[in-house]
Each structure stands twice: as structure tokens, then as C-alpha cells.
Amino acid sequence: MLVFMSDDLAGFSRQTTVPDGAAGRRFDAVLAELFPEFSRSRLTEWIKSGDVLLNGVLVRPRDPVYGGEVVWLQVMPDIRTDAVPQDIPLDILYEDEHVFVINKPAGLVVHPGAGNPDGTLVNALLHRDPALAAVPRAGVVHRLDKDTSGVMVVARTLQAQTALVEQLSSRQVHRQYLAVVVSALVSGGTVNAAIERHPRDRLRMEVSDTGKEAVTHYRLRERFRAHTALECRLDTGRTHQIRVHMAHLRHPIVGDRLYGGSLKLPKGGTDALVAMLRGFKRQALHAEVLEFLHPVRALPVRIVAPVPEDLCQLLAALREDSALFFEREWR
């Protein structure tokens, strides 16, 4: 059975099992039969780069299989091999010889690509630790959108990266986000709605019956008169997942120009809130909590990224507006 898993980097991961009848054959040959949509040369490249695990460990293309092993295929977009170190400040929440945990600011792209050849998190990481040049994708394990802030883990060794990718694929990593959405919700809930790339606008994702499984749990953190602060937890990690799911509920994230539609201002809002909403230039989404098992020590790690100043100011303006509104209503 083939299982589709997370695609945090707009890549994908899949799990399947080696059939018993394949015993004694080369791993790369069996892999080509399990994933016929990819060329054998590409699969061999992924094996060598550490993107494929057999029973949780790295193997060589020529190694034999015995039947019954679990295959993990985790593919992320290639990061430019010519990325250069750049002295870009990093807010490091935790580090040891195996991992960095970064508090990524809004506005910082994770890896170089079209339109962002440098000035990215990868460039900053290579400056902070030149040895990351020897780790696939410079140690990047998962990503955040450019205008989403918050906590990310980066592997400093291939061993750590392999273990963390496996945890992500098997949904052992806990990720909690703070999101400020339009409308005053009365309760939390779960969105179980598959997501795929929009057929015409390739920058967008959309809910679709033919998409990949996507599950988001959300609960109320703070309720205002026309907005709500939510805590969102991911079971899966699809591209733009929280943004797409909240828009699907018709409660788009404040400041989300891709999925939020036109600016929505509360009737009778304070001048401070109106100015804040007009001037909020990114989606109000922050990766606040990351929990995982240390990839080497196997101990639980829990890291909390402080709420950034722009979101604190937005929440303060919402509180003030709500207080004044309800004060007028109660008179």
C-alpha cells in the first residue's frame, strides 16, 4: 500500500512496503517498480542524497532487499548548490552539535529560488555553520512561507536530518500555530479537506476532492468582536495548509493577500485598529510551538517562539477595539 504524507516544502513524501517477492533484488530496481512515475536515475539520485530510507536507515542503490521492509520517500525541492554564505542575523532559540532551532522572521525566504537568489535562510545558515554545505538542502527539514514567522528546526548532520525527516513523515512532530482570522468564531473544530495545487494559478493551493489529505485542528485562544485568535495544530503539512483551510471556512487569516480577498474592516472600528489592519502587510500566522524527539538523544524537545512584535500590536489593537465596542453596547 502506498501512503501519501506531508509536503511541507512543496515536495512530497510517501511510504510503501517492499513486496515479499522482491527478496534478493537490488534496492534501486525494486524502488523503480514501486514508484514507476519516476525514472530509475532520479530514484537512484534520491537514494544517494538521503531522500529514501529503508526501515528508517540509509542504504545504497545496490543493496539487496529482503521483503517486508518499509520504504520512506521524502523529496523536497532542490536548494541551489551555489548558495553562498551571507551574514544575515539569525534568532537561534536552541542549538547543539546536531540541530539548530530558528525563530524565522516574517519576510525571510527559506531557500534560494526564482526571484530569491540570495538573502535567504539557507544563506544565513551557511554563514553560521559552513559545514551545512555538506548536508542535503543545507540541513533544512521543513519550511515556513516567506511571510509566516516562527519556529523551524534545522539539522546540522545527515544523521539528524534523516531522523527528523522520518519523524515528520510519520507525524511524530507536533506543530502549533497562532493565527488571527476574520470573524468572531464561537468554537474550535477540525478541518479535514484535501488540498492540491490550483490548476491555473500555480502560486495558490485549493481544497479539492482529488487532492492530498490535509487535517487542521483549531481552537479558540482569544475572541474579539470581529476577529478571533486561534491555536492551530497540523496533522499533515501541506503547502499553505492553514491559510487554505481557514479561507475554506470563510474565516481567512488577517493580512493574507493570496487567500483573504479584499480587506475587511469591522464597522465602527477604532482608528488604531483600522490603521493596523490597513498596514498589516503579511498573513497573521506564527509558528509558535515545535515539539520533536531529539534526533540523536531521543529525548523530547519543546521550543516556543515568542509572538513577534507586529502580531502583539495587532492583538493589542483588537483588544482595545473590542473593549470600547462592548463598553458602548453595555451603556
Swiss-Prot record:
Pfam families: PseudoU_synth_2, S4. InterPro entries: PsdUridine_synth_cat_dom_sf, PsdUridine_synth_RluA-like_CS, PsdUridine_synth_RluC/D, PsdUridine_synth_RsuA/RluA, RluA_PseudoU_synthase, S4_RNA-bd, S4_RNA-bd_sf. Residues 25-97 form the S4 RNA-binding domain. It is found in: Cytoplasm. The keyword Metal-binding does not apply. It comes from the Bacteria. Its EC number is 5.4.99.23. The active site is at residue 145. PROSITE patterns: PSI_RLU, S4. Keywords: Cytoplasm, Isomerase, RNA-binding, rRNA processing. It catalyses: uridine(1911/1915/1917) in 23S rRNA = pseudouridine(1911/1915/1917) in 23S rRNA. GO terms for molecular function: 23S rRNA pseudouridine(1911/1915/1917) synthase activity; RNA binding. Belongs to the pseudouridine synthase RluA family. Responsible for synthesis of pseudouridine from uracil at positions 1911, 1915 and 1917 in 23S ribosomal RNA. NCBIfam families: PRK11180.1, rluA_subfam. This is Ribosomal large subunit pseudouridine synthase D.
